[in-house]
Each structure stands twice: as structure tokens, then as C-alpha cells.
């Protein structure tokens, strides 16, 4: 398994938990051979390259990996390393399972109502990186072309970005979400979009989703329009405007099982949902190509450099991303041990500083001691 180095020690803490879960689950009959590959600050310091070609080559060769939070310099023309990894490996589905762990303080009244799998398209939309800088020769030329060919008037002092949404990318993302819903006995899937405004991009995403339901999933799924909200034993598929969704998922999250959405909407929605369950510190993520099997699982938060070297950062997101990785590999027994250990530590209040906030019954642990508590839980199960 490829392991991308993090700027924080949470990587080592997480690896300790992963190895313990595998040892417990399979009685030394299985083992992970870890291989470190570089990206982010460590790669730049050692190789003068934020994302070396060898890192992508190793992920491509071995097909699965897990990644800690990485630093990308703001500005300066350097693209997000996370986005670059996803696009270079064509990891088209960003999958975010969102659930609450009993004992975690949240701002909502019923965090336990959140049990949602969010599928976010990972390769297109405004994240495709097709942008032109204000006052550049390229943006002036494009402005001139758009005015002459389409009559579009765009202010001359504008930067311009392109928002591609393709049928190919939309269908494979929604197909992955539908397959997940089928395999996990989910009752509904919501296509979240802004097609009321962007009719030929996000509106097309919605339309292609409904077409896919009819053409490939009609035996197991049905649209709201075709059943008037009464799907019988099939998965109910409906669409929700993105801004309305952000309201509805706060008021009635129990009505949503699986979400399929575009890249930018998914970025907003996944972090908003994470806030409902206690924050991104316990929110895992995976970037997956279900067609060729390649995947990179990752912590969903940033590097928090102000806590570097303090043994303070919460490794929960990366550890739970490892649980996702195990389940994707078919190592469900190891995954179950990780989940049970996490549930026990959190419910007993043995947590890192961020999860201790607002709790009177919590014992604040360092990052390493939190990992040790998880290992002890695994060994006692």
C-alpha cells in the first residue's frame, strides 16, 4: 500500500492503528507492506518537486494508497497537489461517508440522523484548472472571441474560468453512487445540482443521471417523477437544487442516504455535513476509480502547521480513511476493528483536544496517546 507522507506525525499514529487492526483481524496471516512515496513539503524539500512523477507512477503501479494532509503553496501558479493526484490518476469519485460517533459534541440537535454517503465528481467542473488571469493576452483574446462569436459581453478586467461538465464523467460518477446504494441496501439517492441556473452543465448532470436510472438501473431504481414518490422496493432517485439541499440536509438529514453531485457542490456539501457530525477531524474520504480499481484514501483536513511537532493533531480522519481503505480491499474484519475501537475511545471520552471541547467527561490525549488508546481497544476486542 502506498503511503504519502504528511507534514504531521498523524501518519505514524495511523499506521500503528492500521497494523494493529490487521494483526488482530487475521492473526498474523495478513500484513500490509507499507511503501512511502513523497508529495507536498517533504517532496519539495528533498526533490524540489511538490508532486514527483515517481509518486504518481507508484500509485498507478500498486493501485491503492493512503495520504495524509499535504501543503500546497497559495498562489504562485502551483496547482493543488490533492487535485493533481486525483486528475492524473483519474480518480473520478470522491467518496465521503458521513456519520456521527456517540460522544462527539456537535452544533446540531440530532447528529445521529446523519448517515450519508456523498459521491462528488472529482475531475471536472471549475476544479479542472482551466483559468485565464485578468489582463493576460490569453484572456483578452478569449474575450474578443466570445464577443465576436456569441455576442457575450464580459468585463475587460475579468479573470475567466471554464466549467466543463461531460456526459462521460457525470454518468460514471452517478453510476458509482447507484451501485453503492444497491450494494448497501440504501433507500434513496439525491442528485444535487444548480441546473436551475447552469442549465447546460449542472442541468445536464441532472438529466444524464435520470437517463442512467432508466437505461441501466430500472430494475432496482426509479425516479420520483415516475413513481410519485412511491418507489416500492426500489431505490428512490430525486434531484435537489444545491442551495435547497444545504438547507434540507440540516433540517432533515435522515431523509438522505446517498448523494451524487458535481465537484464544487460536493466540496461545499461534504464539509457542511462534516460540521453536523463534529467536524472534519473525524470525517474520512476516498478518491476512487471504480472502473480500473485505483484509489487513494486521505485525511479530509489540512496540515495545521501551527500544531506541527506538538503531538496534538487529531489522526481520526486519516484513521477512518484507512477503515474505508480496508473495506474497499475487502478486509472488512480489520475495518470493523478500527470502527469499534474509535467508537469506544470517543464514547469513553479518551480523545484529542479538538474532540474534548465542550465535554466535561473528556480526557484530553496527545495524538500518540489517542492512537495508543485505539490500539488497546483493538487488542481488547
Predicted stretch roles:
Residues 43-146, 159, 264-268:
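N-terminal glycine-rich phosphate/adenylate-binding segment common to multiple enzyme folds
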Residues 27-33, 184-193, 218-238, 331-339, ...:
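Flexible, glycine/charged-enriched surface loops at secondary-structure junctions
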Residues 41-44, 246-350:
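Glycine-rich phosphate/nucleotide-binding loop
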Residues 26-52:
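N-terminal beta-loop-helix "entrance" segment that forms/cooperates
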Residues 164-218, 238, 242:
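Active-site pocket-lining segments that scaffold enzyme catalytic pockets across diverse folds
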Residues 1-5, 10:
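Single conserved hydrophobic/aromatic residue that forms the stacking wall/gate
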Residues 56-73, 216-292, 378:
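Glycine-rich phosphate-binding loop
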Amino acid at each position: 500500500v502506498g503511503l504519502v507522507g504528511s507534514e504531521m506525525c498523524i501518519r505514524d499514529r495511523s499506521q500503528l492503528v492500521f497494523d494493529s487492526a490487521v494483526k488482530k483481524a487475521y492473526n498474523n496471516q495478513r500484513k500490509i507492506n507499507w511503501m512511502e512515496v513523497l508529495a507536498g513539503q517533504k517532496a519539495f524539500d528533498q526533490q524540489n518537486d511538490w508532486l514527483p512523477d515517481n509518486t504518481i507512477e507508484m500509485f498507478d503501479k500498486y493501485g491503492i494508497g493512503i495520504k495524509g494532509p499535504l501543503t500546497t503553496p497559495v498562489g504562485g501558479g502551483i496547482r493543488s497537489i490533492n487535485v493533481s493526484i486525483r486528475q492524473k490518476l483519474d480518480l473520478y469519485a470522491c467518496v465521503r461517508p458521513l456519520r456521527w460517533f456517540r460522544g462527539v459534541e456537535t452544533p446540531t440537535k440530532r447528529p445521529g440522523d446523519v448517515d450519508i454517503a456523498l459521491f462528488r465528481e472529482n475531475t471536472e467542473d471549475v476544479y479542472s484548472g482551466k483559468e485565464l488571469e485578468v489582463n493576460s493576452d490569453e484572456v483578452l483574446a478569449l474575450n474578443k472571441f466570445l464577443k465576436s462569436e456569441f455576442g457575450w459581453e464580459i468585463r475587460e478586467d475579468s479573470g475567466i474560468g471554464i466549467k466543463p461538465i461531460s456526459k462521460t464523467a457525470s454518468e460514471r460518477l452517478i453510476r458509482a453512487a447507484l451501485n453503492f446504494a444497491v450494494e448497501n441496501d440504501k433507500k434513496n439517492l439525491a442528485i444535487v445540482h444548480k441546473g436551475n441556473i447552469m442549465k447546460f452543465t449542472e442541468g445536464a448532470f441532472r438529466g444524464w443521471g435520470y437517463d442512467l436510472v432508466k437505461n441501466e438501473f430500472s430494475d432496482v431504481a426509479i425516479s420520483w417523477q415516475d413513481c410519485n414518490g412511491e418507489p416500492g422496493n426500489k431505490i428512490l432517485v430525486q434531484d435537489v437544487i444545491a442551495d435547497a439541499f444545504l438547507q434540507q440536509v440540516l433540517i432533515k438529514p435522515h431523509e438522505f442516504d446517498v448523494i451524487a453531485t458535481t465537484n464544487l457542490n460536493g466540496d461545499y456539501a461534504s464539509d457542511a455535513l462534516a460540521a453536523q457530525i463534529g467536524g472534519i477531524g473525524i470525517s474520512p474520504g476516498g478518491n476512487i476509480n471504480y472502473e480500473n480499481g485505483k484509489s487513494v484514501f486521505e485525511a479530509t483536513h489540512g496540515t495545521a502547521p501551527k500544531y506541527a511537532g506538538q503531538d496534538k493533531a487529531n489522526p481520526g480522519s486519516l484513521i477512518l480513511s484507512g477503515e474505508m481503505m480496508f473495506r474497499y480491499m475487502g478486509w472488512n474484519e480489520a475495518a470493523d476493528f478500527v470502527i469499534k475501537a474509535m467508537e469506544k475511545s470517543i464514547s469513553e471520552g479518551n480523545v484529542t483536544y479538538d474532540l474534548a471541547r465542550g465535554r466535561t467527561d473528556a480526557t484530553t490525549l496527545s495524538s500518540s496517546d489517542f492512537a495508543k488508546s485505539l490500539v488497546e481497544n483493538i487488542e481488547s476486542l
